[in-house]
Amino acid sequence: MYKDLKIKKILVALDGSENSKRAVDYAIKLGQELSADVMALHIVPAGKYLPEQNLEKGTKHDYAYLDKISEQSVSAGVDLETQIIKAESSVIDEIAEYADKENIDLIVIGIRSVSEFRYMLGSTATGVVVNAPCPVLVVK
């Protein structure tokens, strides 16, 4: 049934937390092992950087974070594309829509703990698992 299952495009959803750093490590390692491309996506929640001057400062910080991830992927020999998107809807919907639009084969996302996955149905990771158009690997 899964003989032809090929993972060629991996999306790692980032928020700058320790959890997402572990997710990046997994995504890059998987990309290396599977010869897959990795896309690192950071979504800025609507209204996070208000007033306008904070948006610029926040975006500079976000790009610096993504640059560091790019360096990590280059060291591992993995093609990595980074992108920052300002959420027009929920972060969960943005991740699912991006994965669908880009024909992603696997989403990798971090989570704080197993108890969060079981009990916090409103969490981003749980929402992505429920709404994603492809398999999701949850990293704790």
Please annotate each region the language model reported.
Residues K3-N54, Q72-A76, E81:
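Small/aliphatic-rich secondary-structure junction motif
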